[in-house]
Every structure is written in structure tokens, then in C-alpha cells.
């Protein structure tokens, strides 16, 4: 093994250890869609039980990721029934995929010398946002990692592999399509041989996943793309779920990349070394700023590109001042490590390491109850719960917050919802009706003091994101279920 390969191996080991430590020691959900759009649908495919959100009632999501998760869940069921087993295995695989950011950063900086490669790869290994998002089971994150690797491979002349990864990224997150297309256009321009190689690698992937899989899953090719656009853009679902100002993403970048002016200058300098990546990041931010509904995860492609471009910018700056080559990389590495640690552990971003922790822990506690025959859930929005993903028991769940056909202001369609057990719908009793049918469940998740006289608390949980809300408790009443 060469010295540079050994250096990269050490960085990858550090990066993977940090990412695994994050999800093994910090129970958190990056976003509720992670549970209900992907884990929950995988659980439903594997075991027949799960909450079915409107996206899967209407068929605007690809079944690719849920099917992959379902396979892992079935395999882990041969070992044990702990839901954290399959959750952590899937998170571990996603964390392994996230290491492509470290590889790309290191390899792109090698031209400036060993210390430049260590600085850039090291920054990608320890940057807090990359560690936080790495284990996330979200198409935005997985597609971004595929896209980053594709752009680097295309730059190395491996167009067919790049095309295959671009096709996969497009099928996972078609909203990244314009950004990746702009980046590839910069790389390839009028080189028709490279375009042909990209098409040879990418078109079969797109046809197989977007065309055939959607046809088998939903009855029409590419339905997860065109119906998604119809529902969210033309029928107003996306905007009805929330609007943010055009300053939403700049405000996040100001916090996540503080001190932004210094790091932004490094990004600009680094963009000269990897312009395609800078184009992809810039187009992602511009296009998503124009969309009313904004969430940080939507622009993860830009967030992942940031540390690479910052490292390349610092590497170019160090190269310009030879007298700094021995001292600057070490000093910059220490400073960036401390900065990453500070941003991860100080408000306002520190609270997200415990996002929905109490909710997940309550469902995990219910999983461990041998006498469980039915579970009631109060005081939590249905998509903030752990669902069957974290309960992983073949018993009915009854949600107080249940609307079978939610109508959002500004949207022309109703969002249909269902709870399935053994492939059959579980009748729900929303609102006050849940208390009237407590014979159907003998365990109840509710805020402390809101369970009723017949229920005794077994364990209570809280987290930083609950604020002043009462702890969330798992309660039990004597007897079984009617």
C-alpha cells in the first residue's frame, strides 16, 4: 500500500468511526420522512405492518429504497427481533456510502500534495454536518453521495460508471437532475463520445428503476416522477405543507458554515479546482431557493460539496505561500476540527442530535413489553411517532392524531392515510374517541399526566427538542385487549 493510500485508509477509518459513533450513541431522526417514507414502507413490505402515508397511497415515491430496506429487515429477522438491529445496519450502510465525500475530497486535493489531501479529506471526515446526515436514510442524502461520486468519476474519464451513478441519483431524487445536468454539461460539453458513454451507463438504470419498477409498483412508467410533480407543484401540496422565505438557506449556511465570509472565500477559490461540483452546489441552492417549501435536507448536495470546496480552496491558498506549507495544514486542521465541534454542540444546531428521541424511545420501550396486545398513541402527531419501524410487534396501533383524508389549505387534493397490520387496514379512533375504546389496547404512549386513571406509567422520556412539553411516557393498564 502506498503512503497516500494508507493516509486515505486512516481518514476513512476516522470518518466511519465518527459516523457510527453518532448513530450508536445518539438516538435521533434526521427528519420524520426518514421513518415513514422509507423505514416504515420497508417494514410494511417485509412484515405486512406499517403506516401508509399519502405518497404511497397515490404512488408518487419509488419503491427502490423501501424494497432494499425490506430485504435487510427480513435478513435481520433471522438473527433477532430488536428493531434497532435493522435500523443500525441500514444506518451503517448509509454511513459507509457517505465516505465517498472523503474519498472525492482527498483525491481531488492530491494534486496539491500530501498535506493538502490530508487537510481536505480530513475536513470531510470530521465536518459535523456530514457526520450528522451520513446515517440518514433519505433519498436526498443517498442521491447526493451518488451524484458526488459520479462527478468525480466523470472527471477521471470513467464515464460509464458515472452515467450509472447519475441515473441512480436521478431516480432517487429527480429534483437534483438540473444541478447534476449542469455540472455534467460543464465537464463534457461537445465531447459526443463521453456523452455516449454516459448514456450507455445511465439510460439502463433510469429505465429499470424509473420505468420498469414504477410500472410494476404503481401501474405506470416514471409515475414517481411525473405524479410527484403534478401533486406537489400543480396541485399545491408542497407549498401547503409550509412556506419559507428566500433567506431560509442563506440563514442556515450562515449558522452551519460560520464564519461564512472566510469559508465562502475558500469555496470560491476551491471552485476553480472542481468547477463541476461548484456548479452542482450552486444550481441546487438557486433552484431550491425558488421553491416555497424549504427544508435543509433538500440542499444536502450543496452541503456535502461545501467541505470539499473549502478544503480545495485552503489547499490552493497554502500552495500559493510555500512558507506556510508545513505549518498551515496542521493549524487549519486543528481550527476546523474545533469549529466543527463547536457548531455541532452549541445552539441552535445542538438540539437536532436528540430530535424525536423521546418518541423513538417510547416505541422501543413498548416493543419490549411481553404482554402488549394493542398500543394507543396520544399527544404526538402521527408522523412524529416511531410507527411500526420502532415498535416492530404484530399488534394494532391506534393513533389519536389520525385523519384518513387530510385536506391542506391551498391544496386541491386530500392526503389519504392508512394503518396496516397483516396487510389489512386497522380501524382508527381519532381524537376523543380513542379514550372510549381503551379496551382495544393495554399500553398507551402519552404525555405524563394525560393517560387516565386506569393507566400507570412504566417509563418516561424527554429530549431537548420537546422544550417545555411534559415527558412522554409509556403507560400500562391491567388486563388484555378486547
Task: Give the ranges of each region predicted by the language model.
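Transmembrane signal-anchor helices characteristic of membrane glycosylation enzymes that use polyprenol
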Residues: 6-32, 126-128, 172-175, 202-218, ...
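Signature aromatic-anchored transmembrane alpha helix within multi-pass, membrane-resident enzymes
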Residues: 8-16, 203-208, 274-278, 282, ...
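Transmembrane alpha-helix segments characteristic
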Residues: 10-17, 118-120, 124, 166, ...
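Transmembrane-helix motifs of polytopic, lipid-linked glycan transferases
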Residues: 13-16, 88-115
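Catalytic lumenal/periplasmic loop and adjoining terminal transmembrane helix
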Residues: 27-28, 215, 323-473, 477-480
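Short acidic/glycine- and proline-prone juxtamembrane loop motifs at membrane-interface regions
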Residues: 31, 58-61, 129-142, 296
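Specific aromatic-rich, kink-prone transmembrane helix
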Residues: 104-107, 122-127, 142-165, 305-309
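Membrane-lumen/periplasm interface segments of specific transmembrane helices
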Residues: 174-189, 194-265, 277-278, 289-290, ...
Amino acid at each position: 500500500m502506498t503512503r497516500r493510500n494508507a493516509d486515505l485508509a486512516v481518514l476513512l477509518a476516522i470518518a466511519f468511526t465518527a459516523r457510527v459513533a453518532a448513530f450508536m450513541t445518539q438516538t435521533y431522526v434526521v427528519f420524520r420522512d426518514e421513518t415513514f417514507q422509507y423505514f416504515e414502507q420497508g417494514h410494511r413490505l417485509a412484515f405486512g405492518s406499517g403506516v401508509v402515508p399519502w405518497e404511497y397511497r397515490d404512488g408518487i415515491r419509488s419503491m427502490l429504497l423501501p424494497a432494499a430496506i425490506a430485504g435487510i429487515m427480513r435478513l435481520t429477522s433471522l438473527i433477532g427481533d430488536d428493531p434497532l438491529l435493522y435500523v443500525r445496519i441500514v444506518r451503517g450502510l448509509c454511513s459507509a456510502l457517505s465516505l465517498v465525500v472523503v474519498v472525492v475530497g482527498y483525491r481531488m486535493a492530491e494534486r496539491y500534495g500530501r498535506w493538502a489531501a490530508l487537510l481536505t479529506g480530513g475536513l470531510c471526515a470530521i465536518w459535523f454536518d456530514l457526520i450528522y446526515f451520513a446515517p440518514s436514510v433519505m433519498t436526498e442524502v443517498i442521491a447526493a453521495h451518488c451524484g458526488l461520486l459520479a462527478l468525480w468519476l466523470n472527471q477521471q474519464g470513467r464515464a460509464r460508471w458515472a452515467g450509472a451513478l447519475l441515473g441512480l441519483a436521478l431516480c432517487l431524487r429527480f429534483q437534483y437532475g438540473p444541478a447534476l445536468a449542469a455540472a455534467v454539461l460543464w465537464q463534457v460539453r461537445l465531447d459526443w463520445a463521453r456523452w455516449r458513454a454516459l448514456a450507455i451507463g445511465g439510460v439502463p438504470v433510469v429505465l429499470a428503476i424509473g420505468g420498469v419498477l414504477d410500472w410494476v409498483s404503481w401501474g405506470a412508467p416514471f409515475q414517481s416522477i411525473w405524479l410527484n410533480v403534478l401533486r406537489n407543484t400543480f396541485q399545491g401540496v408542497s407549498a401547503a405543507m409550509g412556506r419559507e422565505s428566500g433567506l431560509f438557506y442563506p440563514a442556515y449556511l450562515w449558522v452551519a458554515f460560520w464564519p461564512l465570509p472566510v469559508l465562502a472565500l475558500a469555496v470560491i477559490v476551491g471552485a476553480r479546482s472542481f468547477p463541476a461540483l461548484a456548479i452542482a452546489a450552486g444550481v441546487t441552492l438557486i433552484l431550491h431557493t425558488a421553491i416555497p417549501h424549504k427544508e435543509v435536507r433538500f440542499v444536502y448536495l450543496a452541503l456535502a460539496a461545501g467541505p470539499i470546496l473549502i478544503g480545495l480552496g485552503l489547499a490552493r491558498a497554502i500552495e500559493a505561500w510555500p512558507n506556510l506549507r508545513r505549518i498551515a495544514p496542521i493549524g487549519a486542521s486543528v481550527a476546523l476540527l474545533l469549529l466543527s465541534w463547536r457548531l455541532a454542540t452549541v445552539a441552535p444546531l445542538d438540539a437536532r442530535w436528540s430530535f424525536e428521541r423521546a418518541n423513538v424511545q417510547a416505541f422501543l420501550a413498548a416493543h419490549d413489553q411481553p404482554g402488549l396486545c394493542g398500543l394507543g398513541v396520544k399527544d404526538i402527531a402521527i408522523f412524529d411517532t416511531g410507527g411500526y419501524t420502532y415498535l416492530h410487534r404484530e399488534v394494532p396501533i391506534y393513533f389519536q392524531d389520525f385523519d384518513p383524508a387530510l385536506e391542506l389549505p391551498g391544496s386541491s387534493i386530500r392526503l389519504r392515510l392508512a394503518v396496516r397490520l397483516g396487510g389489512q387496514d386497522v380501524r382508527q379512533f381519532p381524537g376523543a374517541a380513542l379514550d372510549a375504546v381503551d379496551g382495544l389496547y393495554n399500553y398507551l404512549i402519552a404525555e405524563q399526566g394525560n393517560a387516565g386513571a386506569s393507566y400507570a406509567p412504566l417509563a418516561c422520556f424527554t429530549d431537548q427538542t420537546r422544550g417545555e412539553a411534559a415527558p412522554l411516557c409509556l403507560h400500562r393498564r391491567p388486563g388484555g385487549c378486547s
